[in-house]
A protein has these predicted regions:
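Transmembrane alpha-helical segments of integral membrane proteins
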Residues: 398-408
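Small-residue-rich hydrophobic transmembrane alpha-helices
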Residues: 51-111, 148-167, 261, 274-336, ...
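Helix-terminus/linker motif at the lipid-water interface of multi-pass membrane proteins
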Residues: 29, 33-52, 121-128, 184-191, ...
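Hydrophobic/aromatic residues in alpha-helical transmembrane segments
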Residues: 22, 38, 75-76, 116-117, ...
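Transmembrane helical elements of multi-pass membrane transporters/channels
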Residues: 19-38, 140, 174, 203-207, ...
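Residue-level signal for short hydrophobic patches within transmembrane helices
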Residues: 10, 14-33, 37, 60-67, ...
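Short alpha-helical transmembrane segments in multi-pass integral membrane proteins
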Residues: 1-21, 79-144, 177, 188-244, ...
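Short runs within selected transmembrane alpha-helices of multi-pass transporters and secretion channels
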Residues: 72, 140-159, 167-175, 196-211, ...
Length: 455
């Protein structure tokens, strides 16, 4: 299964950006569709409470895995820079550090998750009628984490050279397996929530195996040899420098969503189910933005290492325009067919009511996330991961916590809770964009005066 890499350093950019970003967006959207299949199967063939149990875990899962997922961003930047500088031997050393880090981090998440699962769900005010099922789902789900980390980090390595297609192949294979097992475990064996979680573990095992196969059959620069697995500290430090702020940003970001989820939980199982159903479409719109943000990071990493400032500027403009336009188009499709889409998950009028509120106030405005995501992606590509992290934590996370405890507390309604999303996006987007242009001017003034080091 050969895949021609994308030359990010030469030639027209528009087609290459789209070709690179499209598999990323499709990968995330397909992953969400497969997650939606989990919800649809338990919602239709088990109960709304089972769907709420699965859905109530989403923010918590993101909170725990985000730190290590951020490290995969650092891995992508480190390997991409080495490729941009033409340092093939060093790139291969970095690959082996990345893969071993993935295995270690996956088992760390598994251990921590198993210990803290019931405690954290209790802190989130998960309703009593959902708590037992939610805990069961989460504890089984965490056994998938080593496989998820191998997939994420391995995909980051492949993307660093312009290959975003083969991770998509692995995801499609795993997703089909997941859907089939969902139907078998829930409908045939009546396993309910446990069946959905077990299917997730098995399907992620297959995606991890495929990524490892791709890496062991790569060209020499990125080829994985298990005998060479070791942590090389200079690359680990480079990964941490870029990835840790990104991971902490995502982790704190997820923490603010956990707080919002706790507020959503106060509206009962209908409010949880409605929010969970709508989020399937909201996330898909965001994944388009995230794909172009990842594209901006990888393309900027290689071209910044090659010291091509004009190409870096063009990457920012193209990723922003194409990303925002694509996200808006997808959001409008979801809005036009909102009733049909939501009824895939539930036909209960109360559930649909809550879903409609979230779709109008959040999904429609999802393109606003692109303003800070793509600017932040370019900053990370230049080696500045702390700046977007701090701004996002303050402008999005801290602001949301303040909103929930002040404005929402004084005017308690589902709509008032949802409005915090677009307001925080505007604040954060403005600040990150300003920071990007200031940082870009300073960095580009140094082009030719020093080497773009990986750490």
């Amino acid at each position: 299964m050969k895949n021609k890499k994308i030359d990010m350093l030469n030639g027209p950019l528009v087609g290459k950006i789209v070709i690179f970003a499209l598999p990323l967006a499709l990968s995330s959207i397909l992953q969400q569709l497969f997650n939606s299949a989990d919800l649809a199967v338990v919602g239709r063939f088990d109960s709304d409470k089972a769907m709420a149990a699965v859905g109530s875990n989403s923010s918590l899962v993101n909170l725990i895995v985000s730190l290590f997922l951020g490290l995969s961003v650092g891995a992508n930047v480190v390997v991409a820079r080495l490729i941009g500088q033409g340092r093939k031997d060093k790139a291969n050393e970095a690959v082996h550090t990345v893969v071993l880090l993935a295995v270690i981090s996956g088992f760390i998440i598994l251990g921590v998750g198993e210990i803290l699962a019931p405690i954290l769900l209790g802190m989130m005010n998960v309703p009593d009628d959902v708590l037992k099922l939610a805990t069961l789902y989460l504890r089984i789900f965490f056994f998938a984490m080593p496989f998820i980390e191998i997939y994420d980090f391995g995909s980051a390595v492949l993307r660093s050279k312009g290959d975003s297609t083969r991770p998509l192949y692995a995801l499609i294979t795993a997703g089909v397996i997941n859907v089939i097992l969902n139907l078998v475990f829930v409908i045939v064996f009546k396993m309910g929530v446990a069946g959905v979680a077990t299917a997730t573990v098995i399907s992620n095992f297959f995606s991890a195996c495929m990524i490892l196969y791709f890496l062991t059959h790569e060209e020499e620069m990125l080829r994985l040899d298990v005998r060479k697995l070791r942590i090389r500290w200079k690359y680990l430090l480079g990964i941490i420098k870029i990835g840790l702020p990104a991971g902490l940003q995502s982790m704190v970001f997820s923490l603010s969503n956990v707080v919002i989820q706790a507020a959503i939980n106060s509206f009962g199982s209908d409010g949880i189910a409605g929010s969970t159903a709508e989020q399937n479409f909201e996330f898909m719109a965001y994944f388009v933005i995230n794909a172009f943000a990842q594209t901006a990071t990888t393309f900027t990493s290689q071209n910044f290492a090659a010291q091509d400032k004009e190409r870096c500027k063009k990457i920012y403009r193209l990723c922003t325009f194409i990303g925002l336009a694509s996200c808006l188009g997808l959001s409008l499709i979801f809005l036009i067919g909102r009733h049909l889409f939501i009824q895939i998950f539930s036909t209960d009028e109360n559930v649909i009511h809550y879903a409609m509120i979230r779709m109008w106030s959040v999904c429609l405005l999802e393109l606003l996330t692109g303003v800070y995501e793509i600017s932040g992606g370019c900053l990370r590509g230049m080696g500045h991961s702390m700046t977007p992290a701090v701004i996002t934590v303050l402008g999005t996370c801290v602001f949301r916590l303040v909103w929930v405890n002040t404005i929402y507390a004084a005017h308690r309604s589902y709509l008032m809770l949802m409005i915090v999303y677009p307001v925080s996006w505007v604040i954060t987007g403005t600040a990150v964009t300003v920071a990007y242009f200031i940082t870009r001017r300073k960095e580009f003034a140094q082009i030719g005066k020093r080497r773009a080091d990986i750490i």
